[in-house]
Amino acid sequence: MKVIILGGGVIGVTSAWYLVQQGHEVIVVDRQSSAAEETSAGNAGQISPGYATPWGAPGIPLKAVKWMFQKHAPLAIRPDGSLFQLRWMWQMLRNCDASHYAMNKSRMVRIAEYSRDCIRQLRQDTGIEYEGRQGGTLQLFRDQKQFDNAANDIAVLKQEGVAYELLTAEQLKSAEPALEHVSHKLTGGLRLPNDETGDCQIFTKKLAKMAEEAGVTFLFNKEIKHLLFDGDKVTGVQCHDGLLTADHYVVAMGSYSTEFLKNKITIPVYPLKGYSLTMPIIDASRAPTSTILDETYKIAVTRFDNRIRVGGMAEVVGFNLNILKSRCETLKMVVQDLYEGGGDISKATFWTGLRPMTPDGTPIVGPTAYRNLSLNTGHGTLGWTMACGSGQLLADLISGNKTAIAADDLSVFRYIDGFNTKLLRPGQKLDAVY
């Protein structure tokens, strides 16, 4: 089968890799000059299934109000003038109760855990290197309430069979020795020993090269205009320089997927702006050995080979890619507060990108009402964490293979009123109930 994938970030490239491994003829189309030049270029570097957590959570509405008046707030909301922004925020608020939070986190952890298994297998099969480390992740708490609230996440981790360690402030140095200097500022942490780290851009570019060697065609510097339809079927994709046709089409365009599919498929994917800082290490003893997540500021600090990557925060501001000085100051403040002297802050470089976020935090992976059109988007801040699993899952769905994990509630159909996988008859296709 000939498959065209629209989007050359980590989601599009992993989709291409797994599809070509199953014998398909694959073409990847992207407007950039090479793979992973947008959202996949500068993320925080964490592969953290256990921290796969919806932004829509109990208490978030009240916290959002408080954050409006804080200098280093993890979330900022500024009107972009669109009705879609208001609708998306309302949908997220509707997911901020305990029952929705538990359901959404369970879905996210499922695909994230599977994805980590997939990247481990990929690493074993190919030997791909991307400055990766398998040292676990550590969520840091700065007050007792955060420490106590970890019980809610631990309940889901137990349910999903995810290994964890709840550490006191004094025990943090066993996982991250450099934190010994700042243990008095912390109340403890939640460590997930099976999580990983790595440079997403390096990984994506190397996998793209491997995919090309395996037969995938990459068409870069190509502006994608729109899809052509005939009834319930896609007949082609119009680009700036001509028409491309295939048997099946995959939209993996991140935050731009929503507008691209407008008037054909409604998906609630909104651009959540994030920031990162990268600096060279000057004292390894004061740098992280793996990665931490500061729960107060929602900022991750990750160790690459000779660099420290600091990333996080969220701005609901539309497609705005301006780098704000205040956000850069927050990144600098957090890394200097926890790992002072570990990196050369004077040589820090800054980046911003748009994470494709759904209101329930769960990605959209799978079929649509159009029989030869699939989606792989909406991974939010966890695109790197979920990429390989999403790519493998999508390839299996397109190939008609039995999937390794439940997939129905990861598709766009979950947004249909009254959606319930239990109502589906055995063998019934989801597009029949659209």
UniProtKB/Swiss-Prot annotation:
Enzyme Commission number, as recorded: 1.4.99.-
GO molecular function: D-amino-acid dehydrogenase activity
Catalysed transformations (reactions): a D-alpha-amino acid + A + H2O = a 2-oxocarboxylate + AH2 + NH4(+)
Keyword tags: FAD, Flavoprotein, Oxidoreductase
Cofactor entry: FAD
One Pfam family cited in the UniProt record for this chain: DAO
Domain of life, per lineage: Bacteria
Keyword Oxidoreductase found: yes
Pathway: Amino-acid degradation; D-alanine degradation; NH(3) and pyruvate from D-alanine: step 1/1
Binding site for FAD: 3-17
Gene Ontology terms: biological process: D-alanine catabolic process
A cellular-component GO term for this protein: cytoplasm
Protein role: Oxidative deamination of D-amino acids.
HAMAP family reported in the protein's UniProt record: DadA (MF_01202)
Entry's family note: Belongs to the DadA oxidoreductase family.
Protein name: D-amino acid dehydrogenase
Native source species: Proteus mirabilis (strain HI4320)
